[in-house]
Amino acid sequence: MAAKKSTPTDSGKSKGKKNKAQKGAGQKGAGQIVVATNRKARHDYHIIDTYECGVVLVGTEVKSLREGKASLVDAYATIDEGEVWLRGLHIPEYSMGHWTNHSPRRTRKLLLHRREIDSLMGKVRDGNNTLVPLQLYFVAGKLKVELALARGKQEYDKRQDIKRRTEEREITREMGRRIKGIQG
């Protein structure tokens, strides 16, 4: 009779090396180190969909990012000849690098599956959509970009969002006061 291999679902505990699903690699929030966020993007755009992309970097860029230096303020992505490119991302020169340093605002290639690129191409071409990076973070030692398919907000949309958030805040405050009034 052959011995049955133990799997994580058999007994709840597995012996030996952990696989990627157990380590939490590639999952948002599990072992991720955030380098930079684009806080203005959620204010200026309606986020339709998000994608996790890899980035092609040179060595000094990675070292500079590990120091926590990057700016997504003017960054955006384009699709040229079937490839996705990140433009306007500012990664300052590495402090310990000399003649080997990179250009801070160079165009960087994003890594996505072909079907995702084709889908994005269609969505960007059809409507008034754009590709905006929301966040830069490390997962299992590799830099990832959270890329959003987004549509620009008009000024009145921004005002409506601010008004809605203010009303929600007032409602939660009032509920808190009522609960305290009943208990206290």
Swiss-Prot record:
MF annotations from Gene Ontology: RNA binding
Comp. bias intervals (Polar residues): 1-11
Record function comment: Required for rescue of stalled ribosomes mediated by trans-translation. Binds to transfer-messenger RNA (tmRNA), required for stable association of tmRNA with ribosomes. tmRNA and SmpB together mimic tRNA shape, replacing the anticodon stem-loop with SmpB. tmRNA is encoded by the ssrA gene; the 2 termini fold to resemble tRNA(Ala) and it encodes a 'tag peptide', a short internal open reading frame. During trans-translation Ala-aminoacylated tmRNA acts like a tRNA, entering the A-site of stalled ribosomes, displacing the stalled mRNA.
GO cellular component: cytosol
Domain of life: Bacteria
Pfam families: SmpB (PF01668)
Family label: Belongs to the SmpB family.
Assigned keywords, A-Z: Cytoplasm, RNA-binding
Name by which UniProt lists this protein: SsrA-binding protein
Signal sequence, renumbered to the chain: none
Location of the region described as Disordered in the Swiss-Prot/TrEMBL record: 1-31
